[in-house]
């Protein structure tokens, strides 16, 4: 278990920002975050983050993932000084951080995001992960056994492209296949 004080972070704002689509919400301010072949249980209590990882895992993976090296206090302060509109935006989104996610997953979710909404994008990401990704089961304290699917590699998507119709991607299927072919 790793605990850290972090100002200017709000897990609920990040979850609803349209920046992440694979987080599993357990309840307000408590999530499971799949990342590669592992998952992190994280809970926020005001400015305190309680994470199911070791100190070493935090600094190897999650420090960068949550952009802990950036001074969000200064960014927020600078944005507030621009004008009244930016002040309102800075107040409303003061807990959002730029997450350092897997690049391939970000490219695919960006392609999925055309002409749709956040719940639909989440459903498509989950469906692609279930059809083409690797299933993981993990026991987590207070959560029990949780099943999640690793976001697939471009090779895994191409190997399973005949199964993508189950994902209900529509015209996005050809875009995803084309992107995977370009990457491989």
Predicted regions, residues:
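HhH-family (HhH-GPD) DNA N-glycosylase catalytic core used in base-excision repair
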Residues: 1-184
């Amino acid at each position: 278990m790793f605990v850290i004080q972090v100002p200017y972070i709000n897990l609920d704002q990040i979850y609803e920002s349209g920046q992440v689509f694979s987080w599993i919400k357990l309840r307000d301010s408590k999530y499971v975050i799949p990342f590669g072949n592992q998952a992190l249980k994280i809970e926020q209590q005001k400015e305190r983050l309680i994470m199911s990882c070791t100190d070493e895992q935090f600094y190897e993976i999650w420090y960068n993932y949550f952009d802990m090296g950036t001074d969000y206090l200064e960014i927020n302060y600078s944005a507030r000084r621009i004008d009244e509109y930016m002040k309102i935006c800075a107040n409303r989104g003061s807990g959002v951080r730029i997450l350092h996610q897997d690049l391939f997953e970000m490219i695919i979710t960006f392609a999925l995001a055309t002409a749709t909404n956040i719940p639909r994008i989440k459903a498509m990401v989950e469906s692609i992960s279930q059809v083409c990704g690797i299933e993981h089961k993990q026991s987590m304290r207070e959560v029990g056994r949780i099943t999640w699917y690793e976001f697939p590699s471009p090779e895994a998507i191409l190997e399973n492209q005949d199964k993508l119709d189950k994902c209900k991607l529509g015209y996005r299927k050809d875009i995803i296949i084309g992107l995977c072919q370009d990457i491989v």
